[in-house]
Every structure is written in C-alpha cells, then in structure tokens.
Amino acid sequence: MDLLIKTLDGNEVGKLKVSESVFGLVPREDILQRVVRWQLARRQQGTHQSQGRSDVSRTGAKMFKQKGTGRARHSSARAPQFRGGGKAHGPVVRSHAHTLPKKIRALGLRFALSAKLKADDLIVVDEFNVKDAKTRMLVSCFSKLGFDNALLIGGNEVDLNFSRATSNIPNIDILPIQGINVYDILRRSKLVLSKAAVEVLEERFK
C-alpha cells in the first residue's frame, strides 16, 4: 500500500510504499485498551498513603479496665473504630505497574497506526524542518493542513527550531520516533509522521 507524502505547505511530493502488516491491520479495541491501561498504570505515582493504627499519634495505653464497667472491652484508642484512630486497610505506597508481553505492546502500536490510517487521520510529511523558530508560520501551515489536534512524530532527532516553534501551540505534541506510543497516538485526533519516522517503523516491524 502507498501513502501520500506532503510538505508543510500542503503540496504532494510523492508516495511512500508501506507494508500491510504495519499500517493495514484490522484494529482490535481489546488490545489497544490493554496497552493503554498498561501505560497509564506505569505512569501512576502510587504515593498515596493513609495512617494505620501504628502510625497515628495517640497513646497506646489501655482505654479503661477490662472488667467492671459494663462496657465492651477495648485496648488501644488507635483502633480504626474510634474517632482519631488509624485507617483499616487504607492505601499504601506501591507501584501500580503490571507486566504486558512485548509482543502485545508491539501489536498494540501497529493496531494504533492502522486505526489512524483507516480513519484517514494519518498524514505523512516529508520532513519537520523550519529555518526560524517562528510559531506564527507553523500555525498557518497547520491550519491549512487541518492539524488542530495532532501528534507529530519525527525521526531519530527532531529539528530544534521546529520543536521550539510547536512547543506553545495548544493540542499539538511532537515526539521523536523513539517516543511513539499507543496512548499519545489515540489521545490526538491526527497522527502526523515524518518520512523518516515511517521508514524507522517499517524497519522495526520488518
């Protein structure tokens, strides 16, 4: 299958042949959901914690004598049933990350690429290079191309001027090809790949 290559001015400059096994799959939502959940779980800080009965600042002395009061027997005032006591089974500092097979992760990325192409939301641009880091010029180019909410994926290195010019445009993200991931692809309506990025993806999944 062939993909059209455009310039930032919107002109067509050729076609790029890509494999069906990377860009032509039928997307599976269950795989995409698994990969996104895996990514977001790894991103969670897991620093939540509440004070248990051993953490609260309160006396550990027996509240009142065992017998003779007619009341239920109690020991520590730190017990969770009392006001000011510790939390029972509260959150603790932990990692929320879980494992996901490498093949499933790779498959999820291919499904995400295929889903964008199937929805006509994948565009290939010859290169992400500008002479000056001028945001106004790129905003004009993006509006012509319909990039109002897009993820841009460059080659192994992203042009510094281009990166600076896009940094303060809302709803536009730019990443090098090493940073491509399912979550960022799906959270933006358009996926814009440089020609170099497509070649790297083809080589990776060959």
Curated annotation (Swiss-Prot):
Q: Which SUPFAM superfamilies match?
A: Ribosomal protein L4
Where is the region Disordered? 42-93
* Listed InterPro entries: Ribosomal_uL4 (IPR002136), Ribosomal_uL4-like (IPR013005), Ribosomal_uL4_dom_sf (IPR023574)
- GO terms, molecular function: rRNA binding; structural constituent of ribosome
| Listed Basic residues bias regions | 64-76
Gene Ontology cellular-component terms for this entry are: ribonucleoprotein complex; ribosome
One Gene Ontology BP term is: translation
Bias category Polar residues: which stretches?
42-54
Any idea which UniProt keywords this protein has? Ribonucleoprotein, Ribosomal protein, RNA-binding, rRNA-binding
Q: Which domain of life is it from?
A: Bacteria
Similarity remark: Belongs to the universal ribosomal protein uL4 family.
- The protein's assembly and partners: Part of the 50S ribosomal subunit.
Instruction: Output this protein's name.
Output: Large ribosomal subunit protein uL4
Q: Which organism is it from?
A: Bartonella henselae (strain ATCC 49882 / DSM 28221 / CCUG 30454 / Houston 1) (Rochalimaea henselae)
From the UniProt record, report the name of the gene that encodes this protein: rplD
